[in-house]
Amino acid sequence: PKYSDVLLAVGEIDCRIDSGIIPHKNKFPEKEIKEIILTTVENYLTYIVNNNSDCQHNVIIQGIPCPNIDVRNHSQKNIKQLVEVIRIFNYELKMQSKGKGFGFLDTHQLTNKGDGMSNGSWHIDDYHLSPEGMQEAWRRYGSEKSYEQF
């Protein structure tokens, strides 16, 4: 319904080693990875703004959780690049979302063990959060909203 709360998850598939931004960067090495991310995020959020004008939903954008992949299956260089892509993507997603009046559900901070990799507490597989992880992300989101009021 119009004016309802809507959670949208964008970019999770873009932020994998084998799909999205990293393979695109490898195919077009002259492109800067930050520019690829910036354009990707801008395009997602502009699409949402344009398609939400009639309904006026209260949009909350979900961030990208830290990767929970088996690091033994990938080179250290690829792992480092993945962590950096997810970090930059989340930063842009958060900043641009707030700039457009959207909320931001930070699943990256929740899952980060300190080095950009998953702490292993909230995932159900390599990429997706468990129901408990989502509940904890929402609990923290509510705490942030309460704090921002002061």
Where are the language model's segments positioned?
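Alpha-helical cap/lid subdomain in secreted, periplasmic
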Residues: P1-P131
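Conserved catalytic region of serine esterases and O-acyltransferases that act on ester linkages
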Residues: S121-H128, E132-F150
